[in-house]
């Protein structure tokens, strides 16, 4: 029996000589996340902003390439911006015309395209992003003053004018 006890003691003490046999590696748990700026209310909460260029645009006034309908100004308003949201960027996307400076007319009028710009004439063609627009700290709002018109590609035929442009906002 004495030999049996010695063997048991020897086995227990020698198990410390082989640390890799019974020990596990340490693990680091990394917890991540991101806090983003809260959004403003865009266009009074309406998902769609309709801009009517008019129903009396004469085809004869658009017969020459480059001729255009009158500009139609409109405002895309951001309101109720949280205090923590101080600026934003907005990206414009839609179906580009053959001339990439314009959007494709998907209405029935042939040989015309649509142009979208800021009031200071910055072209907002497909893929354009306006960066770091500063929100008014007193009113917590921003008015993005835009304008649109139809541009002739030559020999415009009567019909409807239609295009959709997506404005995607990123807040900072």
What label would you give each PLM region?
Residues 9-17:
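Bacterial N-terminal signal peptides
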Residues 2-6, 20-172:
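Mature extracellular/passenger domains of Gram-negative fimbrial/pilin and adhesin proteins
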């Amino acid at each position: 029996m004495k030999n049996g006890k010695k063997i048991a003691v020897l086995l227990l003490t020698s198990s410390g000589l082989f640390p890799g046999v019974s020990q596990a590696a340490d693990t680091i748990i990394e917890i991540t996340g991101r806090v983003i700026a809260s959004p403003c209310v865009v266009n009074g909460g309406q998902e769609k902003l309709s801009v009517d260029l008019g129903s009396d645009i004469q085809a004869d006034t658009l017969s020459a390439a480059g001729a255009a309908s009158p500009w139609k100004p409109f405002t895309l308003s951001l309101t109720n911006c949280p205090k923590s949201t101080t600026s934003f960027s907005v990206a414009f996307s839609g179906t580009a015309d053959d001339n990439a400076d314009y959007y494709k007319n998907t209405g029935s009028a042939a040989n015309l395209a649509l142009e979208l710009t800021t009031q200071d004439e910055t072209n907002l063609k497909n893929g354009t992003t306006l960066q770091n627009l500063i929100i008014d700290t007193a009113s917590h709002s921003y008015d993005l003053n835009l304008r649109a018109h139809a541009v002739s590609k030559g020999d415009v035929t009567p019909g409807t004018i239609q295009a959709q442009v997506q404005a995607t906002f990123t807040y900072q």
